[in-house]
């Protein structure tokens, strides 16, 4: 499988139409343990909390986000799960000139159309992503050492390197999953983790003071 990056956000336009962009989806840049910066995508899911993929931030010494308006804000990893390939990042949203409103969780529906949100050349895009199947995905942890099982989604959309963490957003502007890999053998086939898997990480931190959390120390991935 090939990893990918995605972005999400919320910006309502007219009824019965998909938003042109999502303010709640941000670009994440991490540095410290690789020869070049690692970029992934994150989505605001709580006050000052962003969810993304673990393999992009694991072992890094510095992380920041870039909003759709181009503003860069410092961020901090507060929880990480190397088996689910998920991480929570804290950012002081009060400093953002863009409203970073949390997206609600939604249930994935097989056969439904969603929007996959990510970035290309620092510009956010949102494209069609159809949910083909809801399943358990047998894969490996982010270090490719141990076999694990994740609540997953098989989706049809175009994903490239750097899109990892990009959300799948339904017509209600709810997040239903995070893309983390694309197929090496079938064109426009990708894999996502269902958003309810994030509940395990959310239970580890304080909703009132998330920045106080200290995640487990993990090595660089990839």
Where are these regions (language model features)?
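Conserved positions in beta-strands of structured domains
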Residues: 43-45, 76-78, 132, 160
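Active-site region of chymotrypsin-like
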Residues: 21-29, 92-100, 125-208, 214-215
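Short glycine/acidic-enriched loop and turn motifs that connect beta-strands
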Residues: 33-34, 121-122, 185
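Short acidic/glycine-enriched loop/turn segments that link adjacent beta-strands
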Residues: 82-85, 186, 221
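A conserved glycine-rich beta-strand in the N-terminal activation segment of trypsin-fold
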Residues: 12-15, 25-47, 53, 71-74, ...
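Conserved active-site neighborhood of the chymotrypsin/trypsin-like protease fold
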Residues: 37, 48-126, 208-209
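N-terminal targeting leaders that route proteins to membranes or the secretory/organellar pathways
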Residues: 1-19, 208-222
């Amino acid at each position: 499988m090939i990893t990918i990056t995605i972005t999400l956000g919320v910006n309502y336009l007219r009824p019965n139409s998909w938003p042109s962009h999502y303010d709640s989806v941000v670009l994440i840049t991490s540095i410290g343990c690789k020869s070049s910066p690692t970029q992934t995508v994150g989505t605001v899911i709580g006050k000052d909390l962003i969810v993304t993929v673990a393999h992009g931030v694991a072992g890094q010494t510095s992380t920041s986000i870039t909003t759709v308006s181009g503003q860069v804000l410092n961020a901090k990893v507060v929880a990480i799960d190397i088996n689910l390939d998920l991480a929570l990042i804290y950012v002081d949203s009060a400093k953002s000139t863009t409203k970073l409103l949390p997206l609600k969780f939604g249930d994935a529906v097989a056969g439904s159309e969603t929007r996959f949100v990510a970035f290309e050349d620092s510009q956010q895009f949102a494209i069609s992503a159809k949910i083909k199947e809801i399943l358990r995905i047998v894969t490996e942890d982010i270090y490719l050492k141990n076999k694990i099982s994740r609540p997953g989604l098989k989706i049809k959309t175009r994903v490239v390197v750097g899109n990892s963490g990009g959300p799948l957003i339904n017509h209600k502007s709810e997040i239903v999953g995070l893309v983390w890999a694309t197929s090496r053998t079938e064109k426009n086939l990708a894999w996502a983790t269902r958003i309810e898997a994030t509940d395990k990480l959310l239970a580890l931190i304080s909703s009132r003071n998330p920045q106080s959390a200290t995640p487990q120390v993990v090595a660089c991935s990839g």
